[in-house]
């Protein structure tokens, strides 16, 4: 279907507890024998930029604690801030380098990316499938309780905090609403469909969309 594009990417956006990254993304990577990029992307962005991986990791953690993403936007436009600029190691530029790596990787390999606003970063690429995975709140709470061995209150706090961060992060870097279905090619309820069935369904869509190249 896309003869000029030998590789494909699946960009997964997910709510906490839905299993979109911790299960579905990992299983898809195994099925197709390709890499899954999440925090692993920080190392590649560090190598590409010359900025230490520790700074990327610190920025990744700090954004979970800051109010910045709730009050402003820095929509990604593909630009890179040069080393001589005082903003070279700003959170904005660290995101820019992660985005740059994602775009360049698509010329070298197929991969799964979880989060990182990858659906927006790769929005002009025809060889990308964007997927949103969600599930009812109570189901997600129960799943996190079992997965982490924690109580209901802790699970709710964990989910609420992480979902709020992801929503604000996405809005800050894309200017778009995180849960708008029109942002994605495929939207799945992992509770209604089942985690393994989600994997099989996405696998089938990949094979259909990319005309057998992914087999």
Can you name each region flagged by the protein language model?
Residues 124-147, 151-160:
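Conserved phosphate-donor/acceptor-positioning beta-strand/loop module used by diverse small-molecule
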Residues 46-110:
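ATP-dependent small-molecule kinase phosphotransfer cores
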Residues 25, 100-103, 172-215:
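NTP-dependent small-molecule kinase module
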Residues 1-8:
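Extreme N-terminal, non-catalytic leader segments
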Residues 105, 117-124:
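RNA pseudouridine synthases
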Residues 62-71, 151-195:
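Small-molecule kinase domains that catalyze NTP-dependent phosphoryl transfer to phosphate-bearing small molecules
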Residues 12-26:
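Glycine-rich phosphate-binding P-loop
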Residues 34-47:
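Short beta-strand-centered segment that lines the nucleotide-binding/catalytic pocket of NTP-utilizing
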